[in-house]
Structure formats: structure tokens, C-alpha cells
UniProtKB/Swiss-Prot annotation:
Top-level class of the enzyme under EC nomenclature: isomerase
Active-site residues, as the UniProt record annotates them: 37, 257
Residues where N6-(pyridoxal phosphate)lysine is found: 37
Protein name: Alanine racemase
Family: Belongs to the alanine racemase family.
UniProt EC number: 5.1.1.1
Amino acid sequence: MTDAQDTRITIDLDALAHNYAALRARAGDAEVAPAVKADAYGLGAAPVADRLWAEGARSFYVARLAEGVALRRSLGDREATIYVLDGATPGSGEALEGAQLVPVLNSLPQVEAWNVQARSGRLRAALHIDTGMNRLGLRPEELKVLVGSFDRLKRLDVELVVSHLACADTPEHPLNATQLARFQEAAALLPGVRRSLANSGGLFLGEAYRFDQTRPGVSLYGGGPEGRPHPEIRAVATVEAPILQVRVVPRGESIGYGAGWTASDNTRVAIVAAGYADGVPRAAFPRGEVWFDGARRPMLGRVSMDLIAVDVTDCDAARPGAMVELFGANLPVDDAADAAGTSAYERLTRLTLRGVRRYVGGAR
């Protein structure tokens, strides 16, 4: 089998660097600490972090302990700060300390566990405050208990307090201002400790949300901060798949499982080697499109595991081996995601190892 038969994922590291620079300009004096969790949103944490380090990034965020250990190994002797959003989960202490990872502590038991881990010397930590998302994080009243009990923090160097915005992609949502006020109040209990609130969307909410550090993710990788294309953000990943066969479906006949689409006229159809096993959502039909031969072209029928059908009527360029763009430089990932009722986050992170990655613009 050759690469020409596979889904091809082209990752433009120069576009990544452009997006990082655009977000740094938005951040003002605040640090920009990239989120490279989920294998850098499906694009490869090692080469992505490598390029972002070259562009000036010195702090990174991952979700899982294993991601942090792998990133530390990838970065080698470079003195990056790697924050682990899961925090100090049961049994993780030795591995966190061994890889010099900084847990984002999410609960009083995690604080206590990390304090115990620090029995042989002080350890770095960040504290996560829940300001209204109601996932992970210390409630403000728990933070008050914590700062009032010196023993719980005596072995820890708390260097950062963070929270996470639930509705940053909707600037007018009232929860943004509510979370900002709660975060300001909570952070005031830890004077001198650096603060971090803004994700990708938060960077576009205004200066008040930036504080000392920002943590962009999806907008580094080509997704707009409000779930739609943004002029400051370039596509980083272009995903293509080959046409396997071109056929004419006669009027009155249907395509695919469940006979989900029926031809109203004789229709020239390309069968493309991409399906939900390659990250194309099953929900992409009936609104899904691809880019081929200079235009958007509709998907026809249900998405199957390995295949989609595309209308290529009056398109002479459609032939076996020709590559169809699923999203990327011509079809923004936000638009492709919206057509399937999902987000750029999901479209990117669902890219699978079945696709062949190719790095351009500064690859290792």
C-alpha cells in the first residue's frame, strides 16, 4: 500500500507559527502557553511543540499524565514548564515528580496528596478554581479553607491559579462576566501568584480576561475563537482522501446504508476513501461538503466506516486517485464541523492514525 491510497493530513507548521504570533499579539504582556493535549488536537504533539518552542513558547498544557511524560521526553533537555490538567490523580505522584510536571490541582484531596508527595522537597503546583463551569476545580469556598490552612500548602510552590471559561466562544454570554468576577475575587486570596483564565475564545474577549498567562488551543490549530472562520487564524491541517471510483447513479436509485439519498436525476458520483473511521462524522450527511476542483461539493448518503459519496456531476477532473479535501486550506475546519453539528475541536481530534501525516514549513 502507498500513501496515495490513504487519507493524507498535511500540517503546515508555518501556519501554526502565524497563529501563535497572532495570539501573542492579542495577549499583550501575558504569556501564551499552548494547549497541546490530545496529541496537539490530532496534529502531533512532538512536532507541534517543537515548532512552538522555536517560536518562543516556554509553557505547555496537556490533559493526561502520559501526555506530559511523552512531551517531556520529546522536548529533551529544554526547560519547558508542562502543566497537567488532570492534576495529581491517585498513584500519579512519582511519575509527575519524575518527569518534572506541574499538576493543576483540582480538589482538596489532590492538594493533600501533592503535599505528601513533596515530603522530600518542595514541589511546584497550580491551583484550578471552578468559577462556574462545574467540571474540575476547587470551589471558591474550598479555596478560602485552603489558604486559611498553612499546613496544606507548606511544601508546595503554588505558582499559578487558573480557571476555565465555559462560554468564551459566545462573547455576549453573561457567564463570561460572571466567571471573570469570581476569578478575580478568588485570585485575590493568593496575592503574588500568577493568574490564567483565557483560552482561545477568552483571548478575544478583551484585556480584562488576559491576566498573566493565556492558554489557547483550537485557534492555534486553525479553529476560529467563536466556532467560525476568523481572519487572523490560518488553517493548519488540510485533510484529503483519494477518489476510489467514479460512477453514474441512475435516477431513482439510492446511495449507501439505509438508502439515505435517492437520485432525482442521473448523477455522477465519486466514491472517496474516507469515513467515520477517518474522522468524518456520521452526522455530516445531509449538510456535509468537501472541496474538489475549485468548488464545494455535497456529500450524498450516509457516511460509512470507510467511504463517502460525493456529487461530481459536470466535474471532468473526478477520476480514481484524485484527492478530495475534507477540510483545510479551502474548506475551513469550522465550516466542516458546523455542517455535522459539531466543533472544530472534535473534527481535529478525531483524525486517526490511519491517515498519513505530512509536515511542511519547518518540519523536523
